[in-house]
């Protein structure tokens, strides 16, 4: 069977990676106090490409290592490797090529610190989370979420090299937002798909501790998220435009989390899951707009 370009594209989890690289892009813009220079634009564009390719490689490796699990779950049973559209060796070669190209771009044309952090994130998700954490503990998403939370720092590093402690602190605040966002985001999906995870013997929180406990944890993390998203304002990274947007977004997210304690139907968790994606995209969009377009409201 001939492998189509679309099959390779699907291996990269394009929708997931799009959100990842968007947060990296926002990290780049926030790292630059004024309008970027031509050198920063060029470096940022190459950094964006390198991060995107690395994230795509991580997604492909994840599908390679999770093929048996994916075959048992309705949500993932269509993936190219599962249905035989691609062979394992083709996935391995494809992912390896993406990694080589990504690291070459980052080391040669961006900077070494971005390459190191990007590679560490790739290993954290594609290997440590996929091979060990996912199968070992109900806190898999909490611990493994750190690897998926690093893109804003990768973007920040690409255009600055993280030369000062302030750069590290500010970039880490963006990482913290995604890190705290990940559990309520993914647990909402896991509640709806808990039968699939149980069938595949994956110890997701709804499987190991039950749905009521998971709903309470979603509320706890959503409250923490609402607090953490105020930190960019307290350190002067963002102003009132971002603050207003964050307050509205958090109010809706908190309503979903509270309603999850006694949801109207089984599909409500998927509604919260869908909103969580919109939430993160909008939150980072507010960060970027506040930084670039509305300096006069600070």
From Swiss-Prot:
One of its GO terms (molecular function) is protoheme IX farnesyltransferase activity. Signal peptide: none annotated. The gene is cyoE. This is Protoheme IX farnesyltransferase. Pathway: Porphyrin-containing compound metabolism; heme O biosynthesis; heme O from protoheme: step 1/1. GO terms for biological process: heme O biosynthetic process. NCBIfam families: cyoE_ctaB, PRK04375.1-2. The chain crosses the membrane at residues 16-36, 45-65, 93-113, 114-134, 141-161, 172-192, 223-243, 244-264, 277-297. GO terms for cellular component: plasma membrane. It comes from the Bacteria. InterPro entries: Protohaem_IX_farnesylTrfase (IPR006369), UbiA_prenyltransferase (IPR000537), UbiA_prenylTrfase_CS (IPR030470), UbiA_sf (IPR044878). It is found in: Cell inner membrane. It catalyses: heme b + (2E,6E)-farnesyl diphosphate + H2O = Fe(II)-heme o + diphosphate. Its EC number is 2.5.1.141. It is a multi-pass membrane protein. The keyword Nucleotide-binding does not apply. Belongs to the UbiA prenyltransferase family. Protoheme IX farnesyltransferase subfamily. It holds the Pfam family UbiA. The keyword Transferase applies. Disulfide bonds: none annotated. Keywords: Cell inner membrane, Cell membrane, Heme biosynthesis, Membrane, Transferase, Transmembrane, Transmembrane helix. Converts heme B (protoheme IX) to heme O by substitution of the vinyl group on carbon 2 of heme B porphyrin ring with a hydroxyethyl farnesyl side group.
